[in-house]
């Protein structure tokens, strides 16, 4: 007797997910999923709810309607925060700490064991030699690179990236694409928001388009 093949559930799935603010709909209801080894590219104009969607998924905003599943199981808010690494518009860095101190601090703050040494992460994002530089001395692009180093250190399998190409030059955009590709090759997944004309990362990509509420 041939046993049926068992297909692994999606790394993340959303069912009838919706969010409103002051009784005005922001997005939804949405149904989508992302498998291990692929990226979900979330597109839409400003005001379409891209950032809000990622904040809901990350557990930073309450789920009003719908369901979020991780590996086929309904995920509570705290479970999602441990499973996901969120890179938002604000880098979330300590201005009076050095780049290296920030990475050590943030790893300890979340109680996560980094998958690499912080110094190696700085080199990967092009900040070798800036270990002792204070964050307040960095340019916007350098701060974005430091936030990318923090992302790289996270063991979370799902990356939530809100406009990751913002404040980056062409080399920085290439860096983001390489990081996403490496993360997916390791069995991770990524949700990436964009409203610009940037090329999608060179990986297996699923598309989700949001439209601003009327």
From Swiss-Prot:
Gene3D superfamilies reported in the protein's UniProt record: P-loop containing nucleotide triphosphate hydrolases
Catalytic activity entry: heme b(in) + ATP + H2O = heme b(out) + ADP + phosphate + H(+)
Main location as per UniProt: membrane
Recorded GO CC terms: plasma membrane
Any single GO BP term: cytochrome complex assembly
Keywords noted in UniProt: ATP-binding, Cell inner membrane, Cell membrane, Cytochrome c-type biogenesis, Membrane, Nucleotide-binding, Translocase, Transport
The keyword Phosphoprotein is annotated on this UniProt entry: no
Binding site for ATP: 44-51
Compartments, as annotated in UniProt: Cell inner membrane
Enzyme class, first EC level, given as a word: translocase
Its membrane topology: Peripheral membrane protein
UniProt-listed Enzyme Commission number(s): 7.6.2.5
InterPro entries, per the entry: AAA+_ATPase (IPR003593), ABC_transporter-like_ATP-bd (IPR003439), ABC_transporter-like_CS (IPR017871), ABC_transptr_haem_export_CcmA (IPR005895), P-loop_NTPase (IPR027417)
Record-annotated ABC transporter domain positions: 12-214
MF GO annotations: ABC-type heme transporter activity; ATP binding; ATP hydrolysis activity
One Pfam family recorded for the sequence: ABC_tran
SMART domains xrefs: AAA
Subunit details: The complex is composed of two ATP-binding proteins (CcmA) and two transmembrane proteins (CcmB).
PANTHER family: ABC TRANSPORTER I FAMILY MEMBER 1
Role: Part of the ABC transporter complex CcmAB involved in the biogenesis of c-type cytochromes; once thought to export heme, this seems not to be the case, but its exact role is uncertain. Responsible for energy coupling to the transport system.
Family membership: Belongs to the ABC transporter superfamily. CcmA exporter (TC 3.A.1.107) family.
Name of this protein: Cytochrome c biogenesis ATP-binding export protein CcmA
Gene source species: Xanthomonas euvesicatoria pv. vesicatoria (strain 85-10) (Xanthomonas campestris pv. vesicatoria)
């Amino acid at each position: 007797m041939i046993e049926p093949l068992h297909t692994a559930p999606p790394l993340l799935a959303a069912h009838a997910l919706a969010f409103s603010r002051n009784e005005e709909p922001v997005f939804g209801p949405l149904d989508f999923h992302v498998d291990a080894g692929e990226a979900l590219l979330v597109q839409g104009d400003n005001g379409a709810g891209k950032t809000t969607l990622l904040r809901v998924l990350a557990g930073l905003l309450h789920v009003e309607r719908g369901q979020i599943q991780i590996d086929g199981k309904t995920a509570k808010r705290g479970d999602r925060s441990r499973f996901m690494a969120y890179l938002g518009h604000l880098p979330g860095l300590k201005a009076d700490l050095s780049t290296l101190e920030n990475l050590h601090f943030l790893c300890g703050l979340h109680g996560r064991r980094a998958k690499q040494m912080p110094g190696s992460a700085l080199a990967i994002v092009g900040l070798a030699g800036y270990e002792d530089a204070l964050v307040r001395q960095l340019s916007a692009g350098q701060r974005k690179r430091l936030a990318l180093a923090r992302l790289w250190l996270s063991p979370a399998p799902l990356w939530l990236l809100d406009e990751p190409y913002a404040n980056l030059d062409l080399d920085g955009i290439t860096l983001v694409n390489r990081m996403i590709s490496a993360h997916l090759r390791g069995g991770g997944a990524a949700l990436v928001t964009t409203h610009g004309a940037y090329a999608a990362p060179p990986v297996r990509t699923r598309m989700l388009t949001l439209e601003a509420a009327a």
